Amino acid sequence: MRLLICNGSPRGKGSNTALLLKHFTDGFSACGGNSVEVAYLMRTKEHAAIAEKARGAQAVIIAFPLYADSMPGIVKEFIEALGDSQPKSRTKKQKEFPPLGFIVQSGFPEAVHSRTVERYLEKLARRLNARYIGTVIKGGVEGIQSRPAYLNRRLFMAFRSLGRHFGVTKEFHPITMKKLAGMEKFSAISRFFFRLLAPTGLFDSGWDKILKQNGAYERRFDRPYQP
């Protein structure tokens, strides 16, 4: 199988998206007869060429971080390029696009934040006349690059397993997808304790560390655009 993966993170090769994709492609490539190419959508001048490559692949996966309950602008721009590359022929066969799947990762622990864009992506596949493979949703990804290896072991194993299954079936394994998505929403009890702990500043410690590293901690409440 010739697979094209489009990394839609503005951070490119240094992104959390790239790290997850590495383990997915490791699993995918372990299956004989498969080849994979990763294109980086941050290279916006290459969008037209990547769109043409997509039409020549046997399967396409677009992976990106969730931005404001949607997608980065470079991903939307690439989607427009895919539409522009669609043949003008009226025959259904000539307009067909390879099977299309998506991976959406975010820092939010709850899967619900990615459900709106998931519905859009399913509709997008139909509009491109592609078989919709599905959308893998994974929350709680922020900070994985600074975690000890043992904390990421299960996550990376799951993505390798997902890649191996895809390499054989050209499908996302539904059980693995469900495990990766995790909880849909925090329980009422969890939300209650979060409200109790929020005033302590416990949840701000990671951000405070970054602010201090950049000499911006004392200005964290500035409002430069307020009249």
Locations of the language-model features?
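Short, glycine-/small-residue-rich phosphate/pyrophosphate-handling segment
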Residues: P98-G139, Q145-R154
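Amphipathic alpha-helical segments that form well-ordered structural scaffolds
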Residues: H23, G27, Y120-R127, A158-S161
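Amphipathic alpha-helical segments in well-structured domains
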Residues: L21, V75, I79, E118-L121, ...
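A conserved mid-domain beta-alpha-beta active-site/ligand-binding segment of alpha/beta enzyme cores
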Residues: G134-T200
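N-terminal beta1-alpha1-beta2 submodule of the flavodoxin-like/Rossmannoid cofactor-binding fold
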Residues: M1-Q94, E171-P227
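Short histidine/acidic/glycine/proline-rich micro-motifs that form metal-
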Residues: P10-G12, A68, G107-E110, E142
